[in-house]
Amino acid sequence: MAIDLIQEIKTQFQNVEKGGVFFIKQTVMLEEIYGFARENTRFAEGGCCDEANEAEYQLLETYWGRRFKFGGLAGYCHGGRTALGAVSHHVPESEGQKNLLLVAGAHIGYHDGQWGQLPRTGQPGVTTSCGSLAAIVGAGYDAIRNKPADALDRQQRTVEQIILPYLEQCARSGDTPDIVAATRHLMQQIDADLEKIVADLKSGFTGQIALITGITINTVQGNFFSPTRVEVFGRS
């Protein structure tokens, strides 16, 4: 049952909600308090490219209009300053108001009490989620530290370098790397880097910027969301 599942998820992510419910609440808040509307808002999404995350992004896209994508593997903001600077010039204006809605974050699967696991339609076994992050955690510190750079795998290289300090800490302490802890470590970096990029945007963007970040939990009963930041900048 969904109630039992959410209680299990709350053992690791206490503020979790059903993904769709959470984002509907944020949509109402942005409309009623800050004046966001389809005609004055550009929605930009920085999640992982894994199709398991699509339900909530498609929900938001249906409401706010076509999305700009600045994420990639593992939900890191690979588009960086260039992508977010670009989308800040794509924002529609209506009656003197324009708004930029940024949604981003990492993700992790949960199935039968196991974190980092997710069954997928049409596949007989259970897969990993996030696959990018699971590969790094499974490889371990020495393998990632000594892995040569690959010009055809730059996004994965970026995620590896973000997770490397966590893997080193585990290696030094003798602890086994944990997918939940690695996901949190990645999420902290996403939040820190987006904070810097949004600070840059605020100096040149005359509208409001809503930043919603957090960890999506993928399950066979749908996605859940554990927010880490919900902020609106630039309100007069």
Which residues does each PLM region occupy?
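Divalent-metal-activated hydrolytic enzyme cores
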Residues: 1-41, 73-99, 109-236
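Short glycine-enriched loops at secondary-structure junctions
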Residues: 47-52, 107-108
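Short, solvent-exposed amphipathic alpha-helices that sit
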Residues: 52-59
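N-terminal, polar/Ser/Thr-rich
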Residues: 102-106
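Short helix-loop-beta junction
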Residues: 60-69
